[in-house]
Amino acid sequence: LTSDQVAELTILIRDVVIECVGEQKASDVFVKTSTGFYKPEDGGHGGASVDDVSIMSINAGPLKVKASGGIYSREDLEKMVDAGASRIGTSAGIEIIRGEKANTDY
């Protein structure tokens, strides 16, 4: 998706959530970047990108952003938090806590 499409989808999700649960409860809802369970044609990882998390964070309020997929190290995690993620989805939690970089093929 393009940056504009990420922003538009985030705004759409935000508006639907606010319409359904109200603005006060919307702050309990997360908009999620991706599942991470796909491989792009360019061979990169199919997870969250710092740019997408930043765009989503700017446009999601009052919803929070969950960065999911492609987060395999403490450095990856810190970049996502700095970009605006409030929650991290990763299969590498133990490795991140140990200060290691996880090796995974999905």
Where are these regions (language model features)?
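Alpha/beta enzyme core
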Residues: L1-V65, S73-I96, N103-Y106
